[in-house]
């Protein structure tokens, strides 16, 4: 089974289109694990199983687990999604990243315990996203170099806009490091470093790929100095003290 895991916050229109593209896959043995991260429209996720009856969903609401949000980094809901997942192959992605081609089939055929698949991710403008939602073909996209969030030559970051890893390796890594929970950024960069420390080959995939659908920002200044500085200092410290396994209170092994 393949598990597609997402941390969700107020991206319902984009999520719907992403699920539409996932539902076109030839692979049917798949589950969609979504952790709702205190979003305003989270209750609407509970109807997804009716809208996409051929997809298996596991919807987890953070409001059911704690009264208020005590973190600002998505590493926490992602780790919860990992623990809830059942697949032997895991696709980690943003809910607004729709599939251009059959990522599930490519993952099924090409993911091993020796590699990490990093799918190219193009950042669509609002007008491009609007056209995409009409079902028009992709050639209208500009594909400007500056608009790639992840690309083997233009921006080879290998972050989890859309990536795939085996369950065995995810357990070995113990997911994201939750020491980044109270700050912004660097959790994704640090995961890539630990993937390299584990000896996995990072393979950038140009086809199939994903499009990051445009959305308005729904938070206040994510780069405010104090929280950004906290995570930057932690990241720099961990580069001097390399490790493979995340230092989390709760193990991913429980999944």
Regions found by a protein language model. Name each.
Residues 1-21:
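N-proximal low-complexity "stem/linker" segments adjacent to membrane-targeting elements
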Residues 179-255:
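C-terminal catalytic/acceptor-binding lobe
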Residues 20-29:
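Short, acidic, metal-binding catalytic loop of nucleotide-sugar glycosyltransferases
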Residues 65-85:
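Glycine-rich, basic loop-to-helix element that forms the pyrophosphate-binding segment
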Residues 90:
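Short aromatic/hydrophobic "clamp" motif used to bind/position activated sugar donors
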Residues 29-39, 60-64:
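Short beta-strand/loop segment that forms part of the nucleotide-sugar
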């Amino acid at each position: 089974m393949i598990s597609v895991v997402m941390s969700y916050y107020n991206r319902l229109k984009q999520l719907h289109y992403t699920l539409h593209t996932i539902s076109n896959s030839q692979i049917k043995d798949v589950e969609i694990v979504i952790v709702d991260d205190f979003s305003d429209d989270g209750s609407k996720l509970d109807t997804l199983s009716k809208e996409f009856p051929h997809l298996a969903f596991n919807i987890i609401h953070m409001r059911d687990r704690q009264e208020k949000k005590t973190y600002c980094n998505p590493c926490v809901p992602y780790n919860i999604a990992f623990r809830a997942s059942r697949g032997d192959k895991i696709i980690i992605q943003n809910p607004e990243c729709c599939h251009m081609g059959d990522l599930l089939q490519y993952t099924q055929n090409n993911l091993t315990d020796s590699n990490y698949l990093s799918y190219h991710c193009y950042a669509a403008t609002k007008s491009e996203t609007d056209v995409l939602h009409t079902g028009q073909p992709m050639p209208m996209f500009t594909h400007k170099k500056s608009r790639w969030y992840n690309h083997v030559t233009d921006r080879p970051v290998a972050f989890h806009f859309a990536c795939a890893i085996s369950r065995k390796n995810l357990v070995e890594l113990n997911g994201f490091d939750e020491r980044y929970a109270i700050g912004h950024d660097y959790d994704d960069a640090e995961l890539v470093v630990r993937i390299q420390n584990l000896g996995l080959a990072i393979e950038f995939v140009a086809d199939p790929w994903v499009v990051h659908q445009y959305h308005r920002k729904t938070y206040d200044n994510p780069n405010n100095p104090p929280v950004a500085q906290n995570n930057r200092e932690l990241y720099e410290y961990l580069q001097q003290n390399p490790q493979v396994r995340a230092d989390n209170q709760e193990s991913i092994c429980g999944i």
